[in-house]
């Protein structure tokens, strides 16, 4: 991501406008063709056409160019403007996103090596003389912008395509910059490309309307999205007065549950960076057999890149800084009283102002026992603890996709006993108890003689097992099989029940159950201050803790990885929105909502999403993912990378996917394996069959989010909080999803972040190794004192 684009995007999200003012001086017009490059209009258009998204589009446009090649010389002689217009009709249907990326690529790999040194020297002389250079070219702005950036030029005159909904109509905008004459290459090849205003008007054929010259001058920077969605703010019970985050959270104590997670770590760093006057930050961390809670958190601090900049800022005092600001509390959110010791529980209940529960099991279809413990039981125990606190409020992190499998606009509301299917007599509390009972019954059934016999037969069925497995070895294998059987049975039961009620997976089902518990709690305790925060799909950071941070493979990483292979046909609905949001934008929202909770100016539900204010549909998401991969592969060497450039994924219907993609390919591979099975010791295409099965399973897992359920998530409540910020706090705490430039974010931030932090995990590798920091949070005296008290060592309060 270019520094200029990054600064513009970050400035807009923070609520401040970037400086785009131009110097007030007489400009110098500089013709690119002849002085800097020998550039024709045909070659870049041909490059764009040959690199269209689909194979059909490539050959269709190639054929159109071949046809034009016959007629264009005659048209060029009679009317150069019309010939130029006709040439660019070939690009009808190409997206602006693709043209912008291909324009950068064409300049970097084709034009940049061919720049004329003498012409650049002359241009630098003109710049040194104090004149503002305006590049003039017959080429499209998609090519001229990278050239201008390379030369440090701020404005250009070039041809521009008309776009409708991000797609080229094939029509050139006025004024059309006509090519030079037929012999200009031989008569106008001097390195000095300066033209007077009068001569340029004549050369371009603007004599009748010289005023169009000023209209033709455009900024050289890539235009940022101008997304404006009017929001009407009605007066509410909370009023419209200013909300200062710094003043509201000054001296306030926070308990963060889930500090070792993706969102939790980013929010913790933001608190430590942007709120120096906040009170004590307590972190609830569970110990394990190998490490105390403090040791676990210390390892996160020492190994996670999230804390690098904070560590560099404080240097040798980093550990001391953390001990002053943070206290690690041993506990377990899935246990009664949050697993806290009695003394710690009483102390926290008296002192806390905000509890932030960002814990959660994010696997789509986990073991039901794990899902209930982390997503449901943990919420119930957190609410019990909240009831015993003197003044604490609760920020509960959920997900937008608790809405389940239904279409339409999703309001910021907390319905009672909600199911996507609209079951009238559904009771969330009874459903939870039923699931807990099912777990106990299944655990008991796993020990039954019937299941044990089944597991024994399975153990002995394997090749050579009858003679190799006997006595203790056989019993040990049965025990392992029982663990797998129990896990698989409960996983299947949970996902089946979720789909039966209208949720796509266990994760969204159990997250919705936790919201129902909160709704019931608010009915019984109307004075309780609770905000349910629903982010959409949380992805790579835009600014904090640094540009392009991501972690894990539970969101879009696996799907985008697939689109970077030779896989081409993704079943999806083109107009459906894929609702992504950067993790640091979620963090900003959480900080705003925490302040609103403390000030008792909160709403019950906040959705942090982009589908209303800055939608990015599936068609565009798929193409941007492919363009992000293309930019990486184009910079690599090797035949495989060059081949992958040609395999852009495209959105297709489910019918076409089944007929021409992974399902049919799997059927063919299976048929081959069955045919040769009698003649081979093992199927020759067994690995390919397994890979195709993985692809089919992955597509099935993501179908609810890319093919079905067209959701539009309202997100007005957090916008109102951001609008209430005082001017001097908008840079640090302002929230504006409308300022996201999806092209820049996807290609220059998100895909590179996934490639750096997530794809290695998919490939069975570790992300790039970084030197481990030494951050001794636990002093020897503190450790001895904690052990003497029989408590888990933690930072001193």
Model regions and ranges:
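Conserved Rossmann-fold cofactor-binding substructure of NAD(P)-dependent oxidoreductases
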Residues: 305-354
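Conserved Rossmann-fold NAD(P)-dependent oxidoreductase catalytic core, especially the SDR/UDP-sugar
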Residues: 349-350, 354-358, 365-373, 377, ...
């Amino acid at each position: 991501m270019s520094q200029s684009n990054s600064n513009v995007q970050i400035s807009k999200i923070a609520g401040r406008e970037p400086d785009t003012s131009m110097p007030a001086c007489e400009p110098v017009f500089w013709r690119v063709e002849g002085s800097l490059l020998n550039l024709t209009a045909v070659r870049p258009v041909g490059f764009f056409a040959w690199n269209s998204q689909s194979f059909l589009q490539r050959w269709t446009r190639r054929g159109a160019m071949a046809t034009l090649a016959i007629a264009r010389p005659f048209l060029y002689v009679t009317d150069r403007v019309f010939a130029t217009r006709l040439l660019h009709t070939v690009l009808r249907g190409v997206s602006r996103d693709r043209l912008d990326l291909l324009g950068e690529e064409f300049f970097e790999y084709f034009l940049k090596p061919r720049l004329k040194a003498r012409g650049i020297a002359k241009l630098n002389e003109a710049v040194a003389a104090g004149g503002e250079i305006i590049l003039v070219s017959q080429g499209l702005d998609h090519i001229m912008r990278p050239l201008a950036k390379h030369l440090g030029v701020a404005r250009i005159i070039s041809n521009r395509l008309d776009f409708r909904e991000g797609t080229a109509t094939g029509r050139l905008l006025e004024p059309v910059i006509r090519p030079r004459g037929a012999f200009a290459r031989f008569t106008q090849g001097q390195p000095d490309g300066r033209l007077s205003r009068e001569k340029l008007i004549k050369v371009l054929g603007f004599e009748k309307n010289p005023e169009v010259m000023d209209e033709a001058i455009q900024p050289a920077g890539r235009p940022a999205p101008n997304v404006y969605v009017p929001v009407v703010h009605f007066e509410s019970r909370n009023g419209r007065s200013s909300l200062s985050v710094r003043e509201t959270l000054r001296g306030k104590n926070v308990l963060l549950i889930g500090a070792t997670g993706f969102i939790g770590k980013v929010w913790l760093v933001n608190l430590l960076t942007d709120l120096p006057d906040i009170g004590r930050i307590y972190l609830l961390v569970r110990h394990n057999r190998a490490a105390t809670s403090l040791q676990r958190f210390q390892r996160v601090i020492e190994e996670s890149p999230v804390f690098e900049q904070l560590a560099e800022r404080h240097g040798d005092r980093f550990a001391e800084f953390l001990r002053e600001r943070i206290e690690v509390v041993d506990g377990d959110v899935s246990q009664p009283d949050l697993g806290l010791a009695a003394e710690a529980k009483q102390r926290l209940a008296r002192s806390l102002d905000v509890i932030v529960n960002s814990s959660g099991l994010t696997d789509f279809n986990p073991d039901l026992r794990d899902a209930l413990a982390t997503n449901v039981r943990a919420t119930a125990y957190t609410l019990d603890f909240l009831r015993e606190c003197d003044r604490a409020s609760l920020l509960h992190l959920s997900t937008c996709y608790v809405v389940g499998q239904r279409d339409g606009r999703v309001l910021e509301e907390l319905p009672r006993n909600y199911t996507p299917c609209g079951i009238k007599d559904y009771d969330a509390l009874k459903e939870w108890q039923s699931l807990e009972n099912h777990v106990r019954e299944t655990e008991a059934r796993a020990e039954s003689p019937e299941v044990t016999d089944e597991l024994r037969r399975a153990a002995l069925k394997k090749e050579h097992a009858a003679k190799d497995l006997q006595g203790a070895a056989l019993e040990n294998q049965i025990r392992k099989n029982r663990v797998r059987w129990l896990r698989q049975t409960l996983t299947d039961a949970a996902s089946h029940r979720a789909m039966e009620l209208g949720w796509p997976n266990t994760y969204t089902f159990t997250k919705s159950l936790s919201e129902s518990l909160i709704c019931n709690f608010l009915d019984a305790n109307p004075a309780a201050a609770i905000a349910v925060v629903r982010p959409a799909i949380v992805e790579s950071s835009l600014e904090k803790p640094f540009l392009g941070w991501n972690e894990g493979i539970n969101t879009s990483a696996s799907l985008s990885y697939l689109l970077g292979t030779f896989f081409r046909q993704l079943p999806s609905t083109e107009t459906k929105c894929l609702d992504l949001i950067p993790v640091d934008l979620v963090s900003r929202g959480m900080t705003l909502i925490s302040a609103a909770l403390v000030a008792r100016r909160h709403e019950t539900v906040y959705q942090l999403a982009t589908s209303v204010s800055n939608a990015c549909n599936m068609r565009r998401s798929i193409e941007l993912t492919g363009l992000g991969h293309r930019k990486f592969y184009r910079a690599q060497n090797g035949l495989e990378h060059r081949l992958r450039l040609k395999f852009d994924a495209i959105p297709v219907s489910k019918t076409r996917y089944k007929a021409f993609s992974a399902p049919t390919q799997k059927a063919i591979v299976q048929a081959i394996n069955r045919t040769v099975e009698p003649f081979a010791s093992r199927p020759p295409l067994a690995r390919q069959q397994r890979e195709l099965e993985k692809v089919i399973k992955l597509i099935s897992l993501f179908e609810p989010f890319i093919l079905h359920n067209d959701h539009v998530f309202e997100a007005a409540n957090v916008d109102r909080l951001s609008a209430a910020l005082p001017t001097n706090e908008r840079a640090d705490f302002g929230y504006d999803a409308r300022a996201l430039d999806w092209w820049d974010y996807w290609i220059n931030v998100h895909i590179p972040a996934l490639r750096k932090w997530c794809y290695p995990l998919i490939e069975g590798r570790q992300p790039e190794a970084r030197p481990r920091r030494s951050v001794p949070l636990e002093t020897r005296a503190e450790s001895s004192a904690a052990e003497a008290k029989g408590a888990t060592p933690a930072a001193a309060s």
